């Protein structure tokens, strides 16, 4: 689960609400001045998308990168952090999943120190709470989390979510009419994770059935 990267890219990350963050990340990808970025916000605001997109960007440039989903930490140990300071990019997603666990907090603290000492790694972490609100037990780790730049990811409006749905469909080569897009958007939960999952399901179904995404077809596939 650690290395798996989906089809997220910086190009299909809807950046209008988070332009300052994107600009700063781009600058540090080419000229590493700020090593640490802390991204926070509630679920489905795009944290995972952005972290995976950053990894994809580095990999396409033949640079070393790793994405670690800490909400899957039951499947691996703190040994996952060993030698990560040798990577050019380290993305740690869902930091709140391991906060409060002393073993993980100590391992995170050690990783921060190694990355800081080495000076060649861009470290980007995400969490649902701000650095000051995260219930960290280890005081030294709490101070490390305030080292770099902190950004709250701003949620998309409904209009922006609908635009992203259409954009994602276009990038997948899916013919999605405005009528069908509006139908999907009004019938499903309006979070991007749900909408993306539905789009992937519809993409596979339409290819297998060789059908266009009409409203009746969407109804049958999504059980609406």
Report the location of each language-model feature.
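Conserved AAA+ ATPase "sensor/coupling" helix adjacent to the nucleotide-binding pocket
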Residues: 148, 162-175
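Dynamic helix-loop-helix/coil hinge segments at AAA+ ATPase domain boundaries and subdomain interfaces
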Residues: 2-22
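Conserved nucleotide-sensing/catalytic segment adjacent to the nucleotide-binding pocket
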Residues: 79-125
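Short regulatory helix/loop adjacent to the ATP-binding pocket of P-loop NTPases
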Residues: 131-146
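C-terminal helical "lid" of AAA+/P-loop NTPase domains
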Residues: 182-186, 193-207
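Walker A/P-loop nucleotide-binding motif
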Residues: 33-51
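AAA+/P-loop NTPase substrate/partner-engagement loops
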Residues: 60-89
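Conserved AAA+ ATPase "SRH/arginine-finger" region at the nucleotide-binding site
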Residues: 148-160
């Amino acid at each position: 689960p650690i290395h798996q990267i989906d089809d997220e890219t910086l190009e299909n990350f809807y950046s209008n609400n988070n332009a300052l963050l994107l600009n700063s990340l781009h600058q540090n990808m080419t000229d590493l001045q700020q090593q640490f970025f802390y991204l926070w916000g509630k679920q489905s605001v795009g944290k995972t998308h952005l972290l995976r997109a950053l990894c994809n960007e580095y990999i396409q440039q033949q640079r070393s990168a790793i994405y670690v989903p800490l909400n899957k930490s039951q499947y691996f140990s703190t040994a996952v952090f060993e030698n990560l300071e040798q990577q050019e990019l380290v993305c740690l997603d869902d930091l709140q999943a391991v906060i409060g666990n002393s073993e993980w907090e100590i391992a995170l603290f050690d990783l921060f120190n190694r990355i800081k000492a080495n000076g060649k790694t861009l470290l980007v972490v995400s969490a649902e709470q701000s650095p000051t609100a995260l219930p960290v037990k280890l005081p030294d780790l709490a101070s490390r989390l305030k080292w770099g730049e902190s950004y709250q990811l701003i949620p998309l409006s409904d209009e922006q979510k609908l635009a992203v749905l259409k954009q994602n469909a276009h990038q997948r080569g899916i013919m999605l009419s405005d009528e069908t897009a509006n139908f999907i958007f009004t019938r499903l939960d309006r979070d991007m994770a749900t909408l993306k999952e539905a789009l992937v399901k519809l993409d596979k179904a339409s290819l297998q059935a060789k059908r266009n995404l009409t409203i009746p077809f969407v109804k049958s596939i999504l059980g609406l």
